[in-house]
Each structure stands twice: as structure tokens, then as C-alpha cells.
Curated annotation (Swiss-Prot):
It is an enzyme of class 3 (hydrolase). Disulfide bonds: none annotated. The keyword Nuclease applies. Its EC number is 3.-.-.-. This is UV DNA damage endonuclease. It comes from Bacillus cereus (strain G9842). The gene is uvsE.
Length: 317
């Protein structure tokens, strides 16, 4: 069983390398037309150049998974701001794409919790489609839209989970088919359990990104031993390994909050279930210390008898 690892957005070991530098609409409005463009394009260029630095860092450390920052282009989906964030930066998008393709990196996006398809308010669905389209356009500009995924949560329950799930199935029809084809769903820590999310994924033919921490915070009746093979099966039509999210609780009191690093004892039960399933899969680490948490976990896991480190962020068990 091969396990490959990655992390989210910021490389903590790199100095001044945020790929998510911002520009607020308030500050944008205060500027003249030319100043707006100059400032906004400067921030975007920084974010893209920092992303390139991070990719080089990942390549050097043999980290095969990476989640791009959704904030890479500030104000991209703001209704009162229109600008070309693709054509102007074509050379940088292509440079990012070339690195990803040459080194066979697995790239993903994870829009925020407001991108959902369970609402009864049409503008929420419209905004979700706008946001999904923005993420897809970036993947397309990079040249990896057909091999990369945009991960979201199912959404809210709004007091009636069954009705909300019905709305999800109805609202998701409004998402263009080529974008839906590149989306995944994740179980959450309060509302939609693993089994509920799995059922939706199976019905919509959407790959399921299983989050173990969320699962432990929002347990369902079915044991993980039964669920995991079915979860991994949702990826069978993609020719890509299943992906899971790993983090651990900050404390017993703040169980849902992410700790700085991964608690090996917390994730061991999941790893043993995965080992019984004996299917290759990828792991996205969602700890606060990101790449540093990844390195620590790799060191701890590779010290376990039977687990062999075969590259910087890849283990065989």
C-alpha cells in the first residue's frame, strides 16, 4: 500500500512566501482606476510567483500533493470588480502548469464553506457556481483542468436535512457538466456524516474526499471498515488514487479545531483500517503547521516497523 502526502497552500519553511496576499474591496474602491489595476495586478503577480516558489520547494522535497490557495486572485468573484486575471498572467499560469506536469504533482482546490448547493436561496447557488467557475478557470489556465479537483462540503441542513439533500441534487444540475466532472465532496464535522456524504457521492458519481477528523467529530452508525472500500470506490472512474484529509483535534475541549501538528495516536485507527483495505491512497495534511507537520508525521510513520519511506513524502506499508 502506497501513501503519498501533501499539505495546504502556505509553505511554513519559506520566508515571506504567502500565495494568498489580499486586497480588500474597501481599499480597492479608494483608488483611481489606474491605481486599482496596478495594485491588484501587483498582488496577483506576487501570489503567482510565490506559488511557483512553493512548487519548487515541494519538488525539491518530493512532496507530490499540493492544494492551491483559493485566494490566489483577490476579488476575482466580487460582483463589482471585473478584470482579466487569466490572459494578463498567461506566462505565469503556464509556468505553474509546466512545473506541475513535469513533476506529476497532484493539485487541488478547496473553496470556502459558503460555496454550497443545499440552499433554498437562488443567489447562494448562483454564487456557488460563480466560485466553482473561478476555480475551474484557474485550473484550465494552468492546463490541468481535466486532472485536478475542486473539493467542497455538501452544505447546510437548514433544519431539514432530507429537504436540503433533495435541493443539493436539484441545484447541482445548474453547475456546468465540465465543472461538476472535476468536483469532489467531503464529509463535515457537524452536519453531513460520512455515510450521508457517501450516499450523495454515489448518486451523483462524485468522488468522495474522506476527512477522518470530521468523521470522528460527526460519527455515523456504519463502521469505517465498511465505509472505506465504498468511499475509495467513488474514485474508480477517475484513474486517480483516492484522497483523504488528515488532521487532529487541538484539544478535547476544542475537538473540531485543527492542531498544529498531527497526533499519530489519533490517526492510527484510521491507518489500520486503510491497511486492511490495502488500497493506495493520497493524504492531504490539514494541520496548522502544514509542510512542517507533514515532515514530522512522515518521520514518525517511517519509524514504525513495516512502513518504508520511498521518497520525501511517500510511504509504503
Amino acid at each position: 500500500m502506497i501513501m503519498r502526502f501533501g499539505y495546504v497552500s502556505h509553505a511554513m519553511a519559506l520566508w515571506d512566501c504567502s500565495p494568498a496576499k489580499t486586497m480588500t474591496f474597501t481599499s480597492f474602491k479608494k483608488l483611481s482606476k489606474q491605481e486599482r489595476e496596478d495594485k491588484l495586478y501587483h498582488v496577483i503577480r506576487q501570489n503567482l510567483e510565490h506559488t511557483i516558489r512553493i512548487l519548487h520547494y515541494n519538488i525539491a522535497h518530493e512532496i507530490p500533493l499540493y492544494r492551491l490557495s483559493s485566494s490566489i486572485v483577490p476579488l476575482a468573484t466580487h460582483p463589482e470588480v471585473e478584470f482579466d486575471y487569466i490572459g494578463v498572467f498567461t506566462p505565469l499560469w503556464r509556468k505553474i502548469g509546466a512545473l506541475i506536469k513535469e513533476h506529476n504533482l497532484r493539485i487541488s482546490f478547496h473553496p470556502n464553506q459558503f460555496t454550497l448547493f443545499t440552499s433554498d436561496k437562488p443567489h447562494i447557488t448562483t454564487n456557488a457556481i460563480t466560485d466553482m467557475t473561478y476555480h475551474y478557470k484557474i485550473l484550465d489556465a494552468i492546463g490541468i483542468a481535466d486532472s485536478s479537483y475542486i473539493n467542497i462540503h455538501v452544505g447546510g441542513a437548514y433544519g431539514n436535512k432530507e429537504k436540503a439533500i433533495e435541493r443539493f441534487h436539484e441545484n447541482i444540475k445548474k453547475l456546468p457538466a465540465h465543472i461538476k466532472k472535476q468536483m469532489t465532496l467531503e464529509n463535515d464535522d457537524k452536519t453531513y456524516t460520512t455515510s450521508e456524504t457517501l450516499s450523495i457521492c454515489q448518486k451523483e458519481n462524485i468522488p468522495f474526499v474522506f476527512d477522518y477528523h470530521h468523521h470522528m467529530a460527526n460519527l455515523c452508525e456504519q463502521p469505517l471498515e465498511e465505509l472505506l472500500p465504498a468511499i475509495f470506490e467513488t474514485w474508480s472512474h477517475t484513474n486517480i488514487s483516492p484522497k483523504v484529509h488528515i488532521s487532529s483535534p487541538r484539544s478535547e475541549k476544542e475537538f473540531r479545531a485543527h492542531a498544529e501538528y498531527i497526533d499519530l495516536e489519533f490517526i492510527k485507527p484510521f491507518l489500520h483500517v486503510a491497511k486492511k483495505n490495502n488500497h493506495n491512497f493520497d493524504i492531504m495534511i490539514e494541520s496548522k503547521q502544514k509542510d512542517l507537520a507533514l515532515f514530522r508525521l512522515i518521520d514518525e510513520l517511517s519509524a514504525i516497523r513495516g512502513i518504508k519511506r520511498i521518497s520525501g513524502a511517500m510511504l509504503q506499508w
